[in-house]
């Protein structure tokens, strides 16, 4: 009896669609789900596909060619550990487990270490693109043993999204948790992109009272230029979508934005690494405060503040917001890639930043035209400390910073909330400052805690008895 070339565990929408994607490239696929009903449902809904169902773990594992290639698409956390534990009794040394879930990178490092000690290969793989991407071609970020990656690379390259230049959006990221770390930072950048867009929406509504149709037209025009990206493309559609009663749907959606925790993970890691991920971290908090709906409604009746006044010339203000958005986006990506560099140094991953930007160009949620600019910047100078220093981005900062300053000033004066726009200009001004007021903070630390300090005019480390 012939054996299947790869197996997929987990038949929720992402696992199901990845299995169908793999099958559509000519591979035979074994499928398994903890509940028999889910597996039967997938088979019934996809007649004629080369998906072979199995209803016990042992039969599933034994149905695969060796070395076995098993893709896990199960709930991250304890669910992943349980799935691995159920597979291990039937695996042979050299078999490969691929975790395609939204897994915390430290868990991937642990699993890689544990499974390697038992003779198994483990590839922690970030997958971005949602359910449509899983079916038609996602961006894929695999990390783990390089030799194990080579055994699954042919499949991953065939199922990945394809950029405009014909390159598949998959590359070997690095050892152990590197793939899931890059996916985590991708998600943090996604948070930043979405919050910047939300703030632009608030500015255009508050400052110009644009209608939904005008907002859609504005985003359509923006999507044809520097800001061209998946998120701008879907946002223009959102503005004009109506419900069955003829109401604009976005206007009746409750203003509470949920989250799955991946933005928080990115921010927590930045603190561990000492990285100033201010814009991306600032994009997490608005989701939290949005969930305080009852408190906000009550506070709106008690706390005073300015009412938004007209922002002036319509075309001029729209262009200022566009420029502020683009520079804010650049700052967000500069912070994200700076954190990737810090993590690469900390965990010895030897990340290739140009390649990472390349695989974000299609398939994933943050896919955007300007990612090619990031690839170009690292291709020209792989060791650049910060993307803001690359010639293209430096020129944009020169040309667009006044618009960002004007937009933030207008927003503050008119009570419009722009935390990520504000974080963008604060980071930019801090990063370009040769001197910061941190000298006073260090003096305070020495005063109350004898933490010592360095001087600008002398070598050495000093402590002062401040009360003498």
UniProtKB/Swiss-Prot annotation:
It is an enzyme of class 1 (oxidoreductase). It catalyses: 6-phospho-D-gluconate + NADP(+) = D-ribulose 5-phosphate + CO2 + NADPH. GO terms for molecular function: NADP binding; phosphogluconate dehydrogenase (decarboxylating) activity. It comes from the Bacteria. Pfam families: 6PGD, NAD_binding_2. Pathway: Carbohydrate degradation; pentose phosphate pathway; D-ribulose 5-phosphate from D-glucose 6-phosphate (oxidative stage): step 3/3. InterPro entries: 6-PGluconate_DH-like_C_sf (IPR008927), 6PGD_dom2 (IPR013328), 6PGDH_C (IPR006114), 6PGDH_Gnd/GntZ (IPR006113), 6PGDH_NADP-bd (IPR006115), 6PGdom_BS (IPR006184), NAD(P)-bd_dom_sf (IPR036291), Pgluconate_DH (IPR006183). Its EC number is 1.1.1.44. NADP(+) binds at residues 10-15, 33-35, 74-76, 102. The active site is at 183 (proton acceptor), 190 (proton donor). The keyword NADP applies. Substrate binds at residues 102, 128-130, 186-187, 191, 260, 287, 445, 451. Keywords: Gluconate utilization, NADP, Oxidoreductase, Pentose shunt. Gene3D superfamilies: 6-Phosphogluconate Dehydrogenase, domain 3, N-(1-d-carboxylethyl)-l-norvaline Dehydrogenase, domain 2, NAD(P)-binding Rossmann-like Domain. GO terms for biological process: D-gluconate metabolic process; organic acid catabolic process; pentose-phosphate shunt. Homodimer. Belongs to the 6-phosphogluconate dehydrogenase family. Catalyzes the oxidative decarboxylation of 6-phosphogluconate to ribulose 5-phosphate and CO(2), with concomitant reduction of NADP to NADPH. NCBIfam families: gnd, PRK09287.1. This is 6-phosphogluconate dehydrogenase, decarboxylating. It comes from Escherichia coli.
């Amino acid at each position: 009896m012939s054996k299947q070339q790869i197996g997929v565990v987990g038949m929720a929408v992402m696992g199901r669609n990845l299995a169908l994607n793999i099958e559509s490239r000519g591979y035979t696929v074994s499928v398994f789900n903890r509940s028999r009903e889910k597996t039967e449902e997938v088979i019934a809904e996809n007649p004629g596909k080369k998906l072979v169902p199995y209803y016990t773990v042992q039969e599933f594992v034994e149905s695969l060619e060796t070395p076995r290639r098993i893709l896990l698409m199960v709930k991250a956390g304890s669910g992943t550990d349980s799935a691995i534990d159920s597979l291990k009794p039937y695996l042979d040394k050299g078999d490969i487990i691929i975790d395609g879930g939204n897994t915390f990178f430290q868990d991937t490092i642990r699993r890689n270490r544990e499974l390697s000690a038992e003779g198994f290969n483990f590839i922690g793989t970030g997958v971005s693109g949602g359910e449509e991407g899983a079916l038609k071609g996602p961006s894929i970020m695999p990390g783990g043993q390089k030799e194990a990656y080579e055994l699954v690379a042919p499949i991953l390259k065939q199922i990945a999204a394809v950029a405009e230049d014909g390159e598949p959006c998959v590359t070997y990221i690095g050892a152990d948790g590197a793939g899931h770390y890059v996916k985590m930072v991708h998600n943090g950048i996604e948070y930043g992109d979405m919050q910047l867009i939300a703030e632009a929406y608030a500015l255009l509504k508050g400052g110009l009272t644009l209608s939904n149709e005008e907002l859609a037209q504005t985003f359509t025009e923006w999507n044809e230029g520097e800001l061209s990206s998946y998120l701008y493309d879907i946002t223009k559609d959102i503005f004009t979508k109506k419900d069955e009663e003829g109401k604009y749907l976005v206007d009746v959606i409750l203003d509470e934005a949920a989250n799955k925790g991946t933005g928080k993970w990115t921010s927590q890691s930045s603190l561990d690494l000492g990285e100033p991920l201010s814009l991306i971290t600032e994009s997490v908090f608005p989701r939290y405060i949005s969930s305080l709906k009852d408190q906000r409604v009550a506070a709106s009746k008690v706390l005073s503040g300015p009412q938004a006044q007209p922002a002036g010339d319509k075309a001029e203000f729209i262009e200022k917001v566009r420029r502020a958005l683009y520079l804010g986006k650049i700052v967000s990506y500069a912070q994200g890639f700076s954190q990737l560099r810090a993590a690469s140094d900390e965990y010895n991953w030897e990340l290739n930043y140009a390649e990472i930007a390349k695989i974000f160009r299609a398939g994933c949620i943050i896919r955007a035209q300007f990612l090619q600019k990031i690839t170009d910047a690292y291709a020209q100078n792989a060791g650049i400390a910060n993307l803001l220093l690359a010639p293209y981005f430096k020129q944009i900062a020169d040309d667009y910073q006044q618009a960002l300053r004007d937009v933030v000033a207008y927003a503050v004066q008119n009570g419009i909330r722009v935390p990520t726009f504000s974080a963008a200009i604060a980071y930019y001004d801090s990063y370009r400052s040769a001197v910061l007021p941190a000298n006073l903070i260090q003096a305070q630390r020495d005063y109350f805690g004898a933490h010592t300090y360095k001087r600008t005019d002398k070598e050495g480390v000093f402590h002062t008895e401040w009360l003498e």
